[in-house]
Design a protein with these regions (language model features):
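N-terminal intrinsically disordered/low-complexity leader segments
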Residues: 1-10
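Helix-turn-helix
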Residues: 11-14, 18, 22-56, 60
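Alpha-helical DNA-contacting segments of helix-turn-helix folds
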Residues: 58-65, 109, 120
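Hydrophobic alpha-helical connector segments
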Residues: 60, 74-101, 156
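Amphipathic alpha-helical packing segments from all-alpha helical-bundle domains
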Residues: 67-70, 74, 116-143, 150-154, ...
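Secondary-structure edge/capping motif, primarily at the C-terminal ends of alpha-helices
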Residues: 73-80, 109-116, 167-171
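Short secondary-structure transition hinges
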Residues: 97-133, 165
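Hydrophobic alpha-helical segments that form the core
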Residues: 146-169, 177-186
């Protein structure tokens, strides 16, 4: 019985990973559960055994991607505990690294698709929420007004996504120097009034 359970977990994991590749290749609207099952070498009914329906399957993929980032996020937060500014800067820089080094996951995190409803949008937003919460805490610690906080959230998110896109399309070479530039830009934004 334990072997079947492990095999079931392995199948579920394989389906999720194949689902990520499927979304990268075809987009959410064109996801084929049959194609994913074939990729994994399982029956076309197997995904429904693990996920119920297509929506649950996509939600499981998003949850998996969130989990991958949450592991790294927790390590960063622990390493810089007690220093909100450092947590923001390091987590933001870490997120850029995560997006660049895991392009198959980035596609899920940055996905914009008509088929996504508010639940999927909320699940994807959970990845970025801690950064916004940290910025809010930082602004409260330094009595920074709400309008300035909104600007800081906007600029930091723009720096994160802009850097990831520029690294991906070759406008900037991904490396220690350019990553340090992103790091320093985020830090500078926090220090600006």
């Amino acid at each position: 019985m334990a072997t079947q359970t492990k095999r079931g977990r392995d199948t579920r994991q394989a389906l999720i990973k194949a689902g990520i590749e499927e979304i990268n290749r075809y987009g959410v609207a064109n996801v084929s559960v049959r194609r994913i099952a074939a990729t994994c070498g399982v029956s076309c009914g197997a995904p429904y055994k693990h996920f119920g329906d297509r929506r649950e399957f996509i939600a499981a993929i998003i949850d998996y991607v969130n989990g991958q980032w949450h592991v790294q996020q927790a390590q960063i937060l622990a390493a810089y505990a007690g220093d909100t500014k450092a947590q923001i800067v390091e987590m933001s820089t870490g997120y850029v690294k995560f997006l660049v080094e895991h392009p198959h996951l980035r596609a899920i995190l940055t996905l914009k698709d008509e088929e996504f409803d508010n639940v999927y949008h909320k699940m994807r937003g959970e990845v970025e929420s801690p950064t916004q919460q940290l910025i809010q805490r930082y602004c409260e610690e330094y009595a920074i007004p709400p309008d300035v906080r909104l600007r800081k959230v906007y600029v930091i998110r723009a720096l994160i996504m802009g850097a990831a896109i520029q690294f991906e399309n070759g406008e900037m070479t991904y490396g220690a120097d350019t990553l340090q530039m992103v790091h320093d830009s985020i830090q500078r934004e926090l220090e600006l009034p």
